[in-house]
Amino acid sequence: MIYRDFKGLKLSALGFGTMRLPVKNGVYSDIDEEKVAEMFSYAIAHGVNYFDTAWGYHEGNSEIAVGKALSAYPRDSFYLATKFPGYDLSNMGKVEEIFEAQLKKCGVGYFDFYLIHNVCEMNIDAYLNEEKYGTVTYLKKQRENGRIKYLGFSAHGDLGVMRRFLDAYGKDMEFCQLQINYLDWSFQNAKGKVALLDEWHIPVWVMELLRGGKLA
């Protein structure tokens, strides 16, 4: 396994995403936890130490399955990432409720990496309205308290949306997860987004390298 240094951490260059886990009878919400445990065991044995989940994956069950699978390993042997689901505007104003639930679902006391999920045209105004929702303020407080080790964001919006977000919160963001592949380098202007993040000295995490297998 190739590893990358991030603030002294040794992160596997290949992470394990959990948006498309094995399911039973084709039901997206019914995760096959036995198969997930087998997959995690294989990945860990081959050097993977970064696992990524999110509130909405598998209709809310991904975090639970991930927590169960990782409970077999020492907490300091892996890095766990999840996300605040601001892509659903009904979640704005519920950051504390959701964060506490995520800790319980994953069975952990802290998250190594926590992302503001899918900053885009639909939610940028809500994310910027700290007076009303206080999302970023709350998450920064959890970082201060050690319940989030590193705070970042993922983005599917256009370059202008990302620029607005960074103008407000760039100094607080420690990494960004972007959809990068040979199609989206130009189609979603990943090239321009990477250049903007470089100006802010924010490292990039790559997602959707094969667009869910569609580019394989």
Language-model features and meaning:
Residues 1-78, 138, 144:
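N-terminal binding-site loop/beta-alpha segment at the start of enzyme catalytic domains
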Residues 20-34, 83-93, 122-128:
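Active-site mouth loops of central-metabolism enzymes
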Residues 119-216:
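Beta/alpha (TIM)-barrel catalytic core signal, keyed to glycine-rich beta->alpha loops juxtaposed to Asp/Glu
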Residues 7-10, 45, 67-77, 100-109, ...:
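Acidic (Asp/Glu)-rich catalytic clusters
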Residues 104-126:
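Active-site groove signature of glycoside hydrolases
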Residues 14-16, 43, 51, 66, ...:
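Conserved, mostly hydrophobic/aromatic
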Residues 29-43, 91-107, 157-168:
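Short, acidic/polar
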Residues 76-88, 114-117:
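A short, structured active-site edge motif that brings together acidic residues
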